[in-house]
A protein has these predicted regions:
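A solvent-exposed, charged loop/short amphipathic helix patch at secondary-structure junctions
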Residues: 21-34, 120-132
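A glycine-rich helix N-cap at a beta->alpha junction
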Residues: 75-95
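Internal, conserved structured core segments that host functional sites
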Residues: 91-147
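Glycine-rich loop at the start of a catalytic domain that most often binds anionic cofactors/ligands
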Residues: 65, 69-78
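Short, well-ordered, mixed-charge alpha-helical segments that flank or form enzyme active sites
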Residues: 17, 67-70, 110-116
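Short beta-strand segments
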Residues: 10-11, 61-62, 102-107
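N-terminal glycine-rich anion-binding loops that anchor highly charged ligand groups
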Residues: 7-25, 35, 39
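Alpha/propeptide regions of enzymes that mature by internal proteolysis
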Residues: 30, 34-61, 67
């Protein structure tokens, strides 16, 4: 079994542990600081998992909203954090052909998903549907296609 040495992690916020409502992920809400705390805990758990699997290099892309949710000093020291926008490749900024694995943490269901929590695709107010190679897809599918 080949161990993934170079791992890329894209982390969104809407489906991190215990998040169930839009009020928790909007930067101007009182619940946002709680969501940021949980977001970094989920991220650091994913980083630990990648390290346990043999990762030697880990790149993280803060992928929620304006992409400034994670404080660098809170992120596991084994990872390199990319944050802020604009990013040409948006949620997967920093991924390259040299990465052996991609992880998607906190990703949510696409817009229109029955009973999906915080379902949307890119921007719920402007994007209604995205089709890729004849299939409707959400952020996970779009970013996986970019990742290769």
């Amino acid at each position: 079994m080949v161990k993934p040495e170079r791992v890329f992690i894209s982390i969104d916020m809407e489906r991190i542990s215990s998040i169930v409502d839009w009020e928790e992920v909007g930067k101007d809400t009182k619940e946002y600081q709680f969501a940021r705390k949980i977001m970094v805990q989920d991220l650091n758990a994913a980083i630990e998992g990648a390290l346990d699997a043999g990762a030697k290099e880990i790149m993280v892309s803060d992928a929620h909203g304006r992409m400034r949710n994670l404080r660098p000093e809170d992120v596991h020291e084994a990872a390199v954090l990319m944050r802020g926008s604009p990013k040409p490749d948006s949620m997967v900024e920093g991924i390259s052909e040299g990465h052996d694995a991609a992880m998607y943490v906190g990703y949510h269901s696409m817009k229109g998903t029955l009973n999906g929590i915080c379902s949307h695709t890119i921007s719920g107010s402007t994007v209604q549907r995205v089709w890729f190679n004849g299939r409707e897809t959400g952020e996970f599918g779009m970013n996986s296609a970019l990742a290769g």
